[in-house]
Amino acid sequence: MGILETITGPRDLDRLSREQMVELAAEIRQFLVAEVSKTGGHLGPNLGVVETTLAIHRVFDSPRDAIVFDTGHQSYVHKLVTGRQDFSRLREAGGLAGYPQRSESEHDIVESSHASSSLSWADGISRAFGITGQTDRHVVAVVGDGALTGGMTWEALNNISDDNTRKLIIVVNDNGRSYAPTIGGMARFLNTVRTRRTYRGLYETSQRVFGVFGAPGDSLYRGLRGGLHGFLTRVTDNEALYSNLDIKYLGPIDGHDQQAMEEALEQARDYGAPVIVHAITEKGRGYEPARRDVADQFHAVGQIDPETGEPIDPSHAVSWTSVFADEILALADEDPRIVGITAAMLRPVGLHKFAEKHPDRVHDVGIAEQHAVTSAAGLAYGGLHPVVALYATFVNRAFDQVLMDVALHRAGVTFVLDRAGVTGPDGPSHHGMWDLALLQIVPHIRLSAPRDATRLREELGEAVKVDDAPTVVRFSKGSVGDEIEAVRRLDDGVDVLHESASKDVLIVTVGPMATMGIEVAERLAAQGIGATVVDPRWVVPVPRSVVELGGTHRLVVTIEDGVVVGGIGTRIRQDLREAGIDTGVTELGLPDEFLDHGTRSQILERVGLTPQHIARDVVAQVLGSRVPSARPLPEDAERVPMRAEDDEQA
């Protein structure tokens, strides 16, 4: 039996010798490579925090001492030492979440995986401990150097420094990367700290001096190196960044030196005031395929061969992101006004090809979505057309800037929202399900949702030509799927995808839900119900022809992969009422609740967004047994009578 199998909780670490801790770290890395390669997940970040996480749990008493992980994707080691070692269904329905989750363990505090929030959480928790008299409890916030590029981190530091009586420890996990290499002035400063010759020279010289005395000298050196770190920190002025904030700084510490990390954390724990412990770590530590991966060091992987790191079943399907990557480059080649902006996710959002060919026209602003959006407004004012590429879930963080800096000023900015709708295994904070409801209320905005690769190219090209209002192009995660050709295109750009002789039901689909809408129509046809399926392409503002078609059908059904409350269906219903059209509207989408992790198909089935479920309900509405009921047929209409029992066959 290995050491890892004997660990059921953090206090089991206390009985281990230093040699056993080193052995445990090696076992954990072997476990992570073996298990995550089967399920996929955040491999590189977790390989880089093994010793740091073990040290935190040895020095502090979780859950009495609160441990908060920023973004949370580096919490696998934390899960392992807090009694969760069944990784067989990691990120799958019914299995462990890929991020901290309170329902899994009392050791998990913050579930959100959005970056730069941990210090604000730590500020609030430590204040609460003080107010309630729990002054013996510590708060430990683990934050990556990438998250330090987010402004919220510095707002929190400003407030933390205002109260020097709290037992708050900030562990900076500095691996020089967020998803990719960390950028900006903060990154340059930390890199200077890591590589400054004065620090390294003095540290290495002191090690050699003690080493002259053989084993006794080495032992003395190990005993004194915590103090040596502090001394060299002062000598080389590494704490200059934090001195004005009145927060004690310890480091930099080798984050893979278990003993050094424990000594630094013990010193921070006993200090009795806010302390920053700067740990230098290596993303992908101990796994050669990750170390060779220059792009992101296996930040997140699918199923891979653990020996080679190669995908087990490489997909040859074209992804939405790759279609965007090729098309934005083609558009930028033609139009020198187009510039790209990303928030620390150059490759994940597909701007890497643009950046490689036109490096002066693509700007990575770090994990700073608010700044990205307002900077884009400034670029538009200067005569350029910015394309801000984000994951859909992260545009939530910059809503005020979209509203007040872009829309109010009628700035021609295009937002490209990747991973829109249900994203699957990363859980509630990564589903891009709020963008439609959130953005459709912005004045002047134009919002598109392409159903396939051809429409993505079309709508992106149309978006970058709009210079007097914000535009949005949103698409899903994963592969694009087959082309869905229109039966015809109406004069306002709406595509008719399916139509029947009788106009019973108008089905309005948003983006990739077109496939589902067509299948629903086919099921209805088998029941003698005629349906028209349309893809508005540009869903906001609602095209005129969609409203007109709503008036000529007996029932309108909208299908979207965003939250249904305040979504596109709501907008269509309002426009119908304003036009004096009383056709019943059924709005289908995601419920206003946080959806757990699972595959896209599992989640859609869980919330009733399947062709079978939708068709069954629509049949009931046409029969008048379910509200909203379809408008009655005209008295002179000749139709094949339907039987109520046919409802079950839809």
Swiss-Prot record:
<protein>
    <recommendedName>
        <fullName>1-deoxy-D-xylulose-5-phosphate synthase</fullName>
        <ecNumber>2.2.1.7</ecNumber>
    </recommendedName>
</protein>
<dbReference type="Pfam" id="PF13292">
    <property type="entry name" value="DXP_synthase_N"/>
</dbReference>
<feature type="binding site">
    <location>
        <begin position="146"/>
        <end position="147"/>
    </location>
    <ligand>
        <name>thiamine diphosphate</name>
    </ligand>
</feature>
<dbReference type="InterPro" id="IPR009014">
    <property type="entry name" value="Transketo_C/PFOR_II"/>
</dbReference>
<dbReference type="InterPro" id="IPR029061">
    <property type="entry name" value="THDP-binding"/>
</dbReference>
<dbReference type="Pfam" id="PF02780">
    <property type="entry name" value="Transketolase_C"/>
</dbReference>
<dbReference type="InterPro" id="IPR020826">
    <property type="entry name" value="Transketolase_BS"/>
</dbReference>
<keyword id="KW-0786">Thiamine pyrophosphate</keyword>
<keyword id="KW-0479">Metal-binding</keyword>
<feature type="region of interest" description="Disordered">
    <location>
        <begin position="629"/>
        <end position="650"/>
    </location>
</feature>
<dbReference type="InterPro" id="IPR005477">
    <property type="entry name" value="Dxylulose-5-P_synthase"/>
</dbReference>
<dbReference type="InterPro" id="IPR005475">
    <property type="entry name" value="Transketolase-like_Pyr-bd"/>
</dbReference>
<feature type="binding site">
    <location>
        <position position="175"/>
    </location>
    <ligand>
        <name>Mg(2+)</name>
    </ligand>
</feature>
<dbReference type="Pfam" id="PF02779">
    <property type="entry name" value="Transket_pyr"/>
</dbReference>
<dbReference type="GO" id="GO:0009228">
    <property type="term" value="P:thiamine biosynthetic process"/>
</dbReference>
<dbReference type="GO" id="GO:0016114">
    <property type="term" value="P:terpenoid biosynthetic process"/>
</dbReference>
<keyword id="KW-0784">Thiamine biosynthesis</keyword>
<feature type="binding site">
    <location>
        <begin position="113"/>
        <end position="115"/>
    </location>
    <ligand>
        <name>thiamine diphosphate</name>
    </ligand>
</feature>
<dbReference type="GO" id="GO:0030976">
    <property type="term" value="F:thiamine pyrophosphate binding"/>
</dbReference>
<dbReference type="GO" id="GO:0008661">
    <property type="term" value="F:1-deoxy-D-xylulose-5-phosphate synthase activity"/>
</dbReference>
<dbReference type="GO" id="GO:0019288">
    <property type="term" value="P:isopentenyl diphosphate biosynthetic process, methylerythritol 4-phosphate pathway"/>
</dbReference>
<keyword id="KW-0414">Isoprene biosynthesis</keyword>
<dbReference type="GO" id="GO:0000287">
    <property type="term" value="F:magnesium ion binding"/>
</dbReference>
<feature type="binding site">
    <location>
        <position position="145"/>
    </location>
    <ligand>
        <name>Mg(2+)</name>
    </ligand>
</feature>
<feature type="compositionally biased region" description="Basic and acidic residues">
    <location>
        <begin position="633"/>
        <end position="644"/>
    </location>
</feature>
<keyword id="KW-0460">Magnesium</keyword>
<dbReference type="GO" id="GO:0052865">
    <property type="term" value="P:1-deoxy-D-xylulose 5-phosphate biosynthetic process"/>
</dbReference>
<feature type="binding site">
    <location>
        <position position="369"/>
    </location>
    <ligand>
        <name>thiamine diphosphate</name>
    </ligand>
</feature>
<feature type="binding site">
    <location>
        <position position="287"/>
    </location>
    <ligand>
        <name>thiamine diphosphate</name>
    </ligand>
</feature>
<feature type="binding site">
    <location>
        <position position="73"/>
    </location>
    <ligand>
        <name>thiamine diphosphate</name>
    </ligand>
</feature>
<keyword id="KW-0808">Transferase</keyword>
<feature type="binding site">
    <location>
        <position position="175"/>
    </location>
    <ligand>
        <name>thiamine diphosphate</name>
    </ligand>
</feature>
<comment type="pathway">
    <text>Metabolic intermediate biosynthesis; 1-deoxy-D-xylulose 5-phosphate biosynthesis; 1-deoxy-D-xylulose 5-phosphate from D-glyceraldehyde 3-phosphate and pyruvate: step 1/1.</text>
</comment>
<dbReference type="InterPro" id="IPR033248">
    <property type="entry name" value="Transketolase_C"/>
</dbReference>
<comment type="similarity">
    <text>Belongs to the transketolase family. DXPS subfamily.</text>
</comment>
<comment type="subunit">
    <text>Homodimer.</text>
</comment>
<comment type="function">
    <text>Catalyzes the acyloin condensation reaction between C atoms 2 and 3 of pyruvate and glyceraldehyde 3-phosphate to yield 1-deoxy-D-xylulose-5-phosphate (DXP).</text>
</comment>
<dbReference type="GO" id="GO:0005829">
    <property type="term" value="C:cytosol"/>
</dbReference>
